[in-house]
Amino acid sequence: IVSGEIRSVTADIILKKCEEALEESSQPSLKKVINLTGTVLHTNFGRALLPRKTIEEVGDKYANPVTLEYDISKGKRGDRDDHIVGLIKELTNAEDATIVNNNAAAVFLTLNSLAQKGEVVVSRSELVEIGGSFRIPDIMRKAGCRLVEVGTTSRTHLEDFEDAITEKTAMVMRVHWSNFKITGFTASVDQETLADLCKKRKIPFIEDLG
């Protein structure tokens, strides 16, 4: 009325405006975008895309009840991990496996389950913070672990890990650097070497792949 667009307010006008407002407010927040950033697996754009066939199969399955946590052969409740654990064990030669929805959850649960109240040895150069305020020292504290830093920001050697391992050591951890690098006069210990050390000392070794 003030702008002059309408002369009077009727029930039809009110209903139409309410319908428009409701439609606008109920639009999904996820929008399709075209990724022209040059980063193929962009962390803010959903990372790896699912194949169309996979999407169609998932949609078909979840349009109906499925055996998510039910073992038909035994006629009783099952475990949702059963659908994928066998494949992971076959691919990795692991004794067992479980799945969570992101890497941060995997790191936290691993630390909390295997190293709670114990010490976790990590190279000082790997105390990173990545997107979403995922900070290694904070995650360890919340998981109930005690962080033991070894080496320096630029150089960490095998003997640094060897000297830090005690009867209180619950785990040795290696952390992915994500989106930065340390260059120049540097040194680090590779995955295989740390794994061999932990086997000899009979303690778990994990690698956060980011």
Regions found by a protein language model. Give the residues of each.
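Residues that form generic nucleotide/phosphate-binding pockets
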Residues: 17, 21, 25, 57, ...
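Short, surface-exposed helix-loop/turn micro-motifs enriched in polar/charged residues
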Residues: 6, 33, 98-99
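Conserved PLP-enzyme active-site core in the AAT-like
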Residues: 27, 74-210
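N-terminal Rossmann-like NAD(P)+-binding subdomain of aldehyde/semialdehyde dehydrogenases
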Residues: 3, 11, 26-49
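Long amphipathic alpha-helical segments
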Residues: 1-23
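Glycine-rich phosphate-binding segment of PLP-dependent enzymes
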Residues: 36-37, 47-73
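Short glycine-rich or small-residue beta-strand-to-loop segments that form or flank ligand, phosphate
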Residues: 40-44, 71, 121-123
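Glycine/charge-rich, flexible interdomain linkers and switch-proximal surface loops
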Residues: 9-17, 32-40, 76-83, 107
